[in-house]
Amino acid sequence: MIRRELRASLIAVVVLTAVFGFAYPAVMTGFAEVAFHHQANGSLITKNGKVVGSELAAQSFAKPQYFHERPSATTPPYNPGATTFSNLGPTSDALKKQVQAAIAQILKTEGPYNPGLTVHEIPVDAVTTSGSGIDPDISPAYAALQARRVAAVRHMSLGEVKKLISQNTDGRSLGFFGEPGVNVLELNLALDRHAA
């Protein structure tokens, strides 16, 4: 009797492992490759046939002719292999110092192009990290704050830059989830294409 139960248990383990450990993942992977090829392969963005990044992960743009991303919570910064959130609460002194440093940097970087810029005009996403620590999107408000700098450095009209921001702004998911966002990598690539 014990032998029969042991045999049935072993057969169940082998069958369930084969079905849920091999067959089901293979079918789902195949379906994803066919139906969602771009997403299944990391939502990669290419330039001149070379992969330059992903729609899903931020990367650093420090040069003034590019739009800048929001702060990163990963170590080293913008490391997609170490996505994390800061876990700092609103009463945290460390968070206050990070935000104050980010505000000072924004005022230094954007202030000369936006005379009279005040702390209250700086969007929250310009000085805080995202939940993943490497969010590729910024708010349209943060993009608009940077538009004058990018236009001046690239010798473009402000209208041209704002048009590129608008063209690279994604709406809410399904029309009502989340907030509109601007993918920084895609916007910067659009700027490079415009200059070419």
For the regions a language model picked out, list residue spans one by one.
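Flexible, solvent-exposed loop/hinge segments and secondary-structure transition points
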Residues: 12, 20-21, 26-146, 153, ...
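Membrane-entry signal-anchor segments at the cytosolic-membrane interface
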Residues: 1-19
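Extracytoplasmic/periplasmic C-terminal soluble domains
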Residues: 144-196
